[in-house]
């Protein structure tokens, strides 16, 4: 195990802070582990996807597009940074750190930056930005973001620098994506340029992490601490899913724009429930199965890409078509 003293000097105070939380957690408040583990779920990708999708399908198309752009770009950036930095988890940096046993199975791969912190600050922060005139909701969302970040520290699966960087990525994206979307809205063709730019970035990023990036290969008792090949695989298939989401959003905005408010309330509720069930009990487990079983790329990438496209392009086209048919028959 790599000792804390062998790490850069700025890591030591962070380890000390985690040890302080650990002493509190193990000594008196270990029962809070389950609470913080439930809180941290809000930073996982599938739940923000559900929030974005319900907004996109049923409430406000433009707001949903903004949130999906935040979630997608956040995922592309954080996964790329994780592969570049190759920072180990706290319990690898110091054998004094003992993370919550409940959280370890969900904290695989590299540590920096915190994906949960970045995702929550992007999507929940973006939601707060959209609802900035409703102070109570904004304050509640900001508190939830901070609580998610703190939960990663409490559980011992991230250092403060991981969390702070993740929160910063989300904060920067909130304003950057708003500027980009406002620019694209001035001419619909610009959404095609956005799609092209995202695809180019993702392609170059994947080429770099697959062919040129250098990875640490460290063993403890003959066991590889972090398997770079597995991390590369996960990043690649996640990129496929995210590209499906983003390309679907941009193509839908260009060629199939719709206003959920033009659909009657009952239909919107049915659309949200049906789509939500597909995400929660379908796509979520398909994606998990692909990653856990390391399905070969020739099968995994098309499935992941189609899954993303289904949420942001195919499903809206389907329910928009049937809405027109029902309205026509009603006349």
Roles of regions detected by a PLM:
Residues 1-47, 79-109, 222-226, 233, ...:
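N-terminal transmembrane-helix/juxtamembrane module of multi-pass inner/ER membrane proteins
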Residues 32, 44-47, 70-74, 117:
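Generic structural signal for well-ordered secondary structure
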Residues 51-52, 56-58, 75, 91-285:
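Membrane-embedded catalytic cores of phosphoryl/pyrophosphoryl-handling enzymes
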Residues 55-57, 71, 85:
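Short glycine-rich, polar/acidic loop-and-turn segments at beta strand-coil junctions
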Residues 62-64:
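Membrane-interface helix-loop-helix junctions at transmembrane boundaries of multi-pass membrane enzymes
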Residues 66, 70, 74, 78, ...:
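Alpha-helical transmembrane segments in multi-pass membrane proteins
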